[in-house]
Amino acid sequence: MKRDLIMNELTVNDLHLDYGTGATANPILKGVSMHLQKGEVVALLGPSGSGKTTLLRAVAGLESPKQGTIAIGERQVFDGARKFELAAEHRNLGLVFQSYALWPHKTVFENVAYGLKLRKLGAAEIKDKVADVLKNLGLGHLGERYPHQLSGGQQQRVAIARALVYNPPVILLDEPLSNLDAKLREEARAFLRELIVRLGLSALMVTHDQAEAMAISDRILLLNNGKIEQQGTPQSMYETPDTLFTAEFMGSNNRLAAKVVGRDGDRVRLDVHGAQLTGTARGPGSGAEPTTIIRVEEVKISATPVDNAIELPLLTCMYLGDRFECLFKHADGSEAGLRAYSKYKLEPGRYWLQLPAEKLWVF
């Protein structure tokens, strides 16, 4: 056990947390266990109400669990059995709030220096540490400005600088990009990943955006109703989901109304509105009328007949900038439609939509 704690910057074991007490208690976390290794970024991903922000706040010391343990390095900061809980201000964690929570009447320098002053460091040391972290985040020339004089992206960097300035073992990020517009979000996502790699940070990040989680993190914990649904690398979560919930949350999919007509190992023979297709069974099993999905980008468009395909008329194409998203569907709505991507705008007509068996998942 001691070896695991040394390897891990953060260890959470069997954490339970309720809102309310007694008969009105609402379980939010239901036995969550996770770890964060040195230099690793873990994203807590999930829909609203899944428990991801509550887990982050429990680690920070801003929520009180009822059961389980939390350790930062070798130091226990919460133990439900011993009724021990270390106050948030003594956990030495860097926290970046969703709203950034900058003091409007303090300069950038003063905002970043605030935590160091609370720790009663000397003025010269504070000046050096703040100057160093501002330089690292590209804010060296903005030290005397106030928050209202900064862009959204610059405000975010100040919040990160404030969290990093006292060199915490773990930085906690609560929806760090959600307050930025689409263009700034893309730029900030790249900056945040570059900063994490360059400084070797250990970070736990909350997000509801799967693209953001995949781009920034080394590992994803997908939460569903207070439990970890699945965890793994971004690539494994996207390409080999264990459950329907994971498959649907991690990508853009087509759903097909299919009936199982036969099986051969993990290969499943399907009837989809008269078309005979082969798919791949995923998860613990599937019934006679399972949920069958395929990622939109895995659908191959052909003007001529191909194997494992459905023939449908083109209804419309939508221009997305780098590609077209095409919808194939009978105009009368008699069958479910399929979406597929194309580099070019397609001419009206009927097309064969090939659904590769290994990418047609049956749950």
Regions found by a protein language model. Name each.
Residues 11, 35, 71, 352-354:
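ABC ATPase nucleotide-binding domain
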Residues 45-47:
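The feature captures the beta-strand-to-loop junction immediately N-terminal to the Walker
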Residues 60:
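Helix-to-loop junction immediately C-terminal to a conserved catalytic motif
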Residues 66-69, 225:
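Conserved coupling/switch loops of ABC nucleotide-binding domains, chiefly the family-specific signature
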Residues 68-80:
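Conserved ABC transporter NBD signature motif
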Residues 92-94, 98, 102-245:
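ABC ATPase nucleotide-binding domains
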Residues 253, 263-363:
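Non-catalytic connector elements of ABC transporters
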